[in-house]
Curated annotation (Swiss-Prot):
It is an enzyme of class 6 (ligase). It catalyses: tRNA(Phe) + L-phenylalanine + ATP = L-phenylalanyl-tRNA(Phe) + AMP + diphosphate + H(+). Its EC number is 6.1.1.20. Binds 2 magnesium ions per tetramer. The keyword Lyase does not apply. Tetramer of two alpha and two beta subunits. GO terms for biological process: phenylalanyl-tRNA aminoacylation. Its cofactor is Mg(2+). PANTHER family: PHENYLALANINE--TRNA LIGASE, MITOCHONDRIAL (PTHR11538:SF41), PHENYLALANYL-TRNA SYNTHETASE (PTHR11538). It comes from Exiguobacterium sibiricum (strain DSM 17290 / CCUG 55495 / CIP 109462 / JCM 13490 / 255-15). The lineage of its organism: Bacteria, Bacillati, Bacillota, Bacilli, Bacillales. Pfam families: Phe_tRNA-synt_N, tRNA-synt_2d. This is Phenylalanine--tRNA ligase alpha subunit. The gene is pheS.
Amino acid sequence: MREQLEALRDEALQLVNQASTQKELNDVRVKYLGKKGPITEVLRGMGKLSAEERPVVGEIANAVRSVIQTELEQRLVDVKQQEMDAKLALEAIDVTLPGRPKQVGQAHLLQQVTDEIEDIFVGLGYTIAEGPEVEQDLFNFEMLNLPKDHPARDMQDSFYITDEILMRTHTSPVQARTMLASKGEPIRILCPGKVYRRDEDDATHSHQFMQVEGLVVGEEISMADLKGTLEAFVKQMFGEAREIRLRPSFFPFTEPSVEVDVSCFKCGGKGCNICKQTGWIEILGAGMVHPHVLEMAEYDSTKMSGFAFGMGIERIAMLKYGVDDIRHFYTNDVRFSEQF
């Protein structure tokens, strides 16, 4: 019996050493140590042995079982390590290879310019005001001194939904709403947003574009305050070397009204193709709030005055970044957008 058990031990240990996978090791364990294995059979048959043989055979069988189990466990550790080494070698990454950069999204140029304009005016004490894009005729026209027969109300110029509802043509309705809600108190607001007009799309016009308007109402507000505000804005937006000039103009909601020009970025005022040899580039319209507008918003025009200004965000972006076609902003061409 001793020789038989030792032969089983040697046979099992040989197979253990030859095994190269966890499955092969498990097969050896089942074959020799399983419920139907030869060593288990020996232990089960000990009842047939004499009293003198039983302890001797039991000791030998348990020793053989222990040796095989120990070798299986040790070999299993080695096989697992070998399998891991092989897997790592197969999946090895060369850390010296150049990485693959991931494209990261960013704010659209119009959003960047809007944020910059807002930051400038918030720094001057303004608050941001917003309103609906689908607007009442009352706020879009009537409260801005644009009576029913005014040319700007022509159906060809505006997107009307009903006789009294339209897509706003400017962000001025936000000013009217804010003045009404302020109940005669001083205000200083900036109104950015989308506006809509019945324009043919071309290099400089779009049926939808972005506008930002500013409004200040208070006691003893003067044209000098307007000029100083716009000078501060232009220098922060376009550089300290820029100057502005005011030209007389007409807007129904301001009196007096002005067009505001900035000294040319390219030639510094000497004259070039960008400024059409004038040395100046038009950037926005402005003026003192018309007394009728103040009165319709329930302000006392004998005590309160104010100024307003408005500019196209696309135009500011085109001038600052040298964009030659407004349609570039809306074509979703990554080659254009990623430049900014």
